[in-house]
């Protein structure tokens, strides 16, 4: 596999030092001393799995159940009397879980840290990180916007940085990237149970863990190692087979599912993907699918370990994690058992999917691109006649793979004499992604097409931009 990321570049751009990971993560050393390893505890998880099996009557377990039950603080209590009847647990009883890792974004971390400071603890009980991405407004461009945000939000950033230093929490400075892309690149690993103070935290599940979005009070539970309670979700199985056409991406899978299931179709469920079609999808594509599971109300999503996950771990400097995960997968930890029963199953033939778009107003309004023009011309159509702007970015569309595809399209359009007709903004998911875009001339291809590169942050996706609607 080619070197996917530019990992050693170290320079000053956009007004801040970029490139090397530690340049942004100012307190990596402190966090590493308290929590010396980010390697999942596979031996312990496998041992607990062997203890769980008799408690559920030896019935086949879904991957979601394996990852949850191996994180139970007391399986004998939480699974008492369950036997082989899955309905006695799924959707029926609360699970008391131990959390492996916590991630917080700058807008929601403030109250969580203030509450944690009253607990009398000298450091966080689990590995944790804070990411400055939500409070950076997109007005002019990367450098000007970052400098403005550093000034207007200086008190917030100073508080977050000092609290992280005091309590051994890793702090990612403004400009380092979007929380979910950074977590995927650095922390997510197969088999982990993670929490994040953002609804799109399930993005990390694309690497085979269970990542769940929570509020500040739940974050304090994790920081203090208080048992985290979750009503055991039901499991919605999605069987993938076939192969996507060249114009489709993994995003079309979740857009299709949103149209089929609606915004409430996943409520109370973990969406668990299985089937041969999974082997054709990249890890960043799986992250996109799990990220947008939030749009159907899912608790999170689950994926069995695939070689694509191992390649991504290797490309981001985590070869040891990949090797350990492969061994855990062979031992049966990172996939569902044969003959497992789901509460509901949806079948998706990847070869039959078409490029599509969802919206406006609701993320379950799915329209195939081939039908879009005719649909837009209908009198009752909610789609606008003109576009106000375009964004290539957000936590679900800002990976290196996303950017390279868009750059290729931009170059094809330029070759045909086509020009951008509306404002086009680009927000790389992380400084690692942006540096690699620069190295591979992807950033140049997009800016030559008329795009404006913004800071590595949420920006327009969460309304942090100068919006000028068509009248």
Regions found by a protein language model. Give the residues of each.
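N-terminal mitochondrial targeting presequence
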Residues: 1-32
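Fe-S-dependent hydro-lyases/dehydratases of central metabolism
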Residues: 25-471
């Amino acid at each position: 596999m080619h070197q996917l990321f530019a990992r050693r570049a170290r320079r000053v751009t956009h007004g801040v030092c970029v490139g090397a990971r530690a340049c942004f993560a100012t307190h990596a050393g402190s966090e590493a001393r308290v929590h010396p390893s980010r390697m999942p505890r596979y031996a312990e998880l496998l041992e607990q799995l062997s203890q769980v099996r008799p408690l559920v009557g030896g019935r086949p377990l879904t991957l979601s159940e394996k990852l949850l039950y191996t994180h139970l603080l007391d399986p004998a209590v939480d699974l008492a009397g369950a036997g082989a009847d899955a309905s006695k647990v799924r959707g029926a009883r609360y699970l008391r879980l131990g959390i492996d890792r916590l991630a917080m974004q700058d807008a929601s971390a403030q109250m969580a840290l203030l509450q944690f400071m009253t607990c009398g603890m000298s450091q966080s009980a689990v590995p944790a990180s804070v990411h400055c991405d939500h409070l950076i407004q997109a007005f002019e461009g990367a450098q000007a916007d970052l400098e403005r945000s550093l000034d207007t939000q200086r008190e917030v950033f100073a508080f977050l940085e000092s609290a992280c230093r005091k309590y051994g929490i890793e702090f990612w400075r403004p400009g380092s990237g979007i929380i979910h892309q950074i977590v995927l690149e650095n922390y997510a690993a197969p088999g982990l149970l993670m929490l994040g103070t953002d609804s799109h935290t399930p993005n990390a599940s694309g690497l085979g863990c269970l990542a769940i979005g929570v509020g500040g009070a739940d974050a304090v539970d994790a920081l203090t190692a208080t048992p985290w309670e979750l009503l055991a979700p039901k499991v919605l199985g999605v069987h993938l087979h076939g192969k996507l056409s060249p114009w489709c991406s993994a995003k079309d899978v979740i857009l299709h599912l949103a149209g089929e299931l609606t915004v409430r179709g996943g409520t109370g469920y973990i969406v668990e993907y299985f089937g041969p079609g999974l082997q054709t999808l990249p890890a960043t594509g799986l992250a996109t699918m799990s990220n947008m599971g939030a749009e159907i109300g899912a608790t999170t999503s689950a994926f069995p370990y695939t070689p694509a996950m191992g390649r991504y771990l290797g490309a981001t400097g985590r070869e040891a994690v990949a090797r350990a995960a492969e061994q855990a997968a062979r031992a049966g930890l990172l996939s569902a058992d044969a003959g497992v029963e789901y509460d509901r199953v949806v079948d998706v033939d990847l070869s039959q999917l078409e490029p599509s778009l969802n919206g406006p107003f609701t993320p379950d309004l799915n329209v195939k691109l081939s039908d879009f023009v005719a649909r837009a011309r209908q009198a009752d159509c909610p789609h606008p006649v003109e576009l106000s702007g375009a964004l290539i970015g957000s936590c679900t569309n800002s990976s290196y793979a996303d950017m390279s595809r868009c750059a290729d399209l931009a170059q094809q359009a330029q070759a045909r004499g086509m020009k951008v007709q509306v404002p086009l903004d680009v927000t790389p998911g992380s400084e690692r992604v942006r540096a690699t875009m620069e190295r591979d001339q992807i950033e140049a291809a997009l800016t030559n097409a008329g795009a404006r590169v913004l800071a590595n942050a949420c920006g327009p996706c969460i309304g942090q931009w100068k919006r000028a609607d068509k009248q």
